[in-house]
Amino acid sequence: MLYWLVDFASSVPALNVFRYITFRTGGAMVTGALFVFMFGPWIIDNLRLRQGKGQPIRSDGPQSHLSKKGTPTMGGLMILSGLVVGTVLWANPLNPYVWIVLAVTLGFGFVGFYDDYLKVTKQSDKGFSGRTRLAIETIIAAAACYALMRLGRDPLSSSLAVPFLKDTAIYLGWFFVIFGGFIVVGAGNAVNLTDGLDGLAIVPVMIAAASFGLVSYLAGNAVFADYLQINYVAGTGELAVLCGALLGAGLGFLWFNAPPASIFMGDTGSLALGGMLGTIAVAVKHEFVLAVIGGLFVLEAVSVIVQVASFKLTGKRVFRMAPIHHHFEQKGWTEPQIVIRFWIISVMLALAGLSTLKLR
């Protein structure tokens, strides 16, 4: 909403500052952080009161996790609240990319919220049917990708950009909806699998958000896109504001999620944030780069796929436990060791992913 102050810039020249995406991104980040810092304790107290026993802890998981019994979940509500407030205040409300990404984020968040609700009320680690959840996610993601395809109305909007090769894109046509939907759903569930230790998921999410905030800004700027020889997608620069809001809300959440966590993100947050990152990657035509920047999420998801496939085919497990962060727990790594080392890996992968912008 603050973007509309630009209309009064002719009378008050200082209001021209609201034209700049960089300024509004910073404002969204500060707003998101302050909102979570201010209302976080109230949200935690209410969730603890309403949930009673909190998130159920798996009996077949690492024994060290039993000490976390009673910790409330659905902390994603804190992040999403800060994200929405920061976005609504600072983003251009007339930009369709903002609303498409926000719709996917909240849609996935609702799916995750319902899953968390069932787990808490039933005191079981099983939410609602995995197939049903996947079907709903696919519908939301496919609808968003269709909207993105129609929004562009040019061959690029239905194409897959290839890293390292300038002016190279694979035209997918209507298959873009399926491919893009797969990216969004895959990203959502990959982040969901990563969220297994205090602070493990939120920092890599923030690192990826900061990276894609930069990618969005560059891809949405004709001058920078031409210089870097990446695909120019008009209007996507505004997505940097959403990334800023997520970064701020994530910092606020980390304050309460740092070990020992006062609240868990839950599926409410992990599905929503993963879906958001996937949608932004599809919008700015950097789907392959998401696999690099979000490589930690890919690793976690692949470890589960390999574990399940190996057990079904051979009756043997590749890892002591999946996702892979539990494997390292079983090997004797402490929780802080795993979390901080995975953060370091995320930083390195983000730098590697950003370096591809200049490799053409």
From Swiss-Prot:
GO terms for cellular component: plasma membrane. It catalyses: UDP-N-acetyl-alpha-D-muramoyl-L-alanyl-gamma-D-glutamyl-meso-2,6-diaminopimeloyl-D-alanyl-D-alanine + di-trans,octa-cis-undecaprenyl phosphate = di-trans,octa-cis-undecaprenyl diphospho-N-acetyl-alpha-D-muramoyl-L-alanyl-D-glutamyl-meso-2,6-diaminopimeloyl-D-alanyl-D-alanine + UMP. It comes from the Bacteria. One of its GO terms (molecular function) is metal ion binding. Pathway: Cell wall biogenesis; peptidoglycan biosynthesis. The keyword Ribonucleoprotein does not apply. Signal peptide: none annotated. Its cofactor is Mg(2+). Keywords: Cell cycle, Cell division, Cell inner membrane, Cell membrane, Cell shape, Cell wall biogenesis/degradation, Magnesium, Membrane, Metal-binding, Peptidoglycan synthesis, Transferase, Transmembrane, Transmembrane helix. HAMAP family: MraY. This is Phospho-N-acetylmuramoyl-pentapeptide-transferase. It comes from Rhodopseudomonas palustris (strain BisA53). The gene is mraY.
